[in-house]
């Protein structure tokens, strides 16, 4: 495993990355402040909306699922989960997914704050719904949330969670392969920010990033860029595209910014 891949890992980048205090660009300065965890330094306007869905409600649901004895018949169209269960038809314990696969609360809240700091309203697309908790955090940003999932059973579980918290009307959801849903899009469909957290395979990731680029107004986030050699190679490759001016590594994720006003650059945030 090479150093660049190691330094992109969530547990490493938070120690080797730069603080928000060292960001000279106003765009990166505001972004880095929103992503860090000390409320004292959050940018103005980044506070999330408890009236949409309370953090305590999401936290309680996460805890409930961690203790659940339920299983899901799960079909993975990609390369398996970030803990490397194989692809294909498998029975997956909900407790396992809740403990090891879901985005951590601190990261999901930070990304929702970042959305809120970009604008009070926008459109965000998530590819890889899983149990639906990240989408709930995104609802707290006040943005329109759309999420895609390959497994019907997983999506059904996510929808039941949204319904239990009364946010089912705040999330638009679709089921199918990412490729088929991309092909079905209206030619004018676009989002301000896209989060790609599914199909953890290098070539597929490169294809999805390239296909989504014309439909992204501001930023595209690639999760698990250090998950495998192929994923890291894909991340290194997509940064060179002229579609993106700035690439940011943050907690095991790669963030691509259109930012036409900025010089081409690569940054690692703590």
Where do the PLM segments sit?
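A short alpha-helical cap/connector motif
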Residues: 1-193, 200-219, 225-270
């Amino acid at each position: 495993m090479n150093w660049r891949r190691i330094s992109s890992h969530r547990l490493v980048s938070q120690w080797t990355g730069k603080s928000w205090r060292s960001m000279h660009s106003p765009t990166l300065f505001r972004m880095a402040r929103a992503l860090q965890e000390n409320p004292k330094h959050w940018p103005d306007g980044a506070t999330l909306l408890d009236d949409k869905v309370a953090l305590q409600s999401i936290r309680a649901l996460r805890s409930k699922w961690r203790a659940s004895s339920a299983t899901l018949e799960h079909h993975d169209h990609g390369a398996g989960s970030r803990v490397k269960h194989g692809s294909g038809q498998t029975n997956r314990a909900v407790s396992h997914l809740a403990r090891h696969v879901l985005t951590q609360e601190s990261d999901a809240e930070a990304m929702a704050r970042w959305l809120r700091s970009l604008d009070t309203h926008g459109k965000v697309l998530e590819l890889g719904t899983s149990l639906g908790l990240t989408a709930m955090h995104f609802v707290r940003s006040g943005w329109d949330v759309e999420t895609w999932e390959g497994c019907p059973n997983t999506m059904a579980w996510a929808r039941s969670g949204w319904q239990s918290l009364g946010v089912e009307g705040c999330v638009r959801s679709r089921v199918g392969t990412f490729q088929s849903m991309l092909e079905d899009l209206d030619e004018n469909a676009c989002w301000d920010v896209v989060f790609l957290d599914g199909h953890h395979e290098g070539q597929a990731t490169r294809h999805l990033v390239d296909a989504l680029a014309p439909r992204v107004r501001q930023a595209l986030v690639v999760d698990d860029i250090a998950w495998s050699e192929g994923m890291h190679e894909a991340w290194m490759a997509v940064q060179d595209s002229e579609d993106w001016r700035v690439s940011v590594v943050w907690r095991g994720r790669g963030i691509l910014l259109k930012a036409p006003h900025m010089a081409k650059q690569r940054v690692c945030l703590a």
